[in-house]
């Protein structure tokens, strides 16, 4: 879960997630929305993949990235349970 919070702590990675809400995209498609190098985009994508927040799959010669909302939902549920448990202690 720490990887998830690290992955979503960066504004560039949050923007990537926001883009992927619209559907699967290639790294090149994603890179068009940023003024940073393609290797930097790849680095951000790898961090998101390691946290399992996104997944990739090959279609022909292209690799498409997609959002994995299950991991995000699990992390949010944990956080909400943590907060709610703290409220009960007051």
Curated annotation (Swiss-Prot):
CDD domains: HTH_ARSR. GO terms for cellular component: cytoplasm. Its main location: cytoplasm. Pfam families: HTH_5. Residues 1-87 form the HTH arsR-type domain. The keyword Ribonucleoprotein does not apply. One of its GO terms (biological process) is regulation of DNA-templated transcription. The keyword Nucleotide-binding does not apply. Induction: By Spo0A during nutrient starvation through its direct negative control of AbrB, repressed by AbrB during regular growth when nutrients are plentiful. Represses its own transcription. Induced by expression of SDP (active peptide of sdpC). It is found in: Cytoplasm. One of its GO terms (molecular function) is DNA-binding transcription factor activity. InterPro entries: ArsR-like_HTH, HTH_ArsR_DNA-bd_dom, HTH_MetalResp_TranReg, SdpR-like_repress, WH-like_DNA-bd_sf, WH_DNA-bd_sf. Keywords: Cytoplasm, DNA-binding, Repressor, Transcription, Transcription regulation. It comes from the Bacteria. Residues 39-62 bind DNA. Represses the transcription of the sdpIR operon and of several other operons that probably contribute to delaying commitment to sporulation. PANTHER family: TRANSCRIPTIONAL REGULATOR, ARSR FAMILY, TRANSCRIPTIONAL REPRESSOR SDPR. This is Transcriptional repressor SdpR. The lineage of its organism: Bacteria, Bacillati, Bacillota, Bacilli, Bacillales.
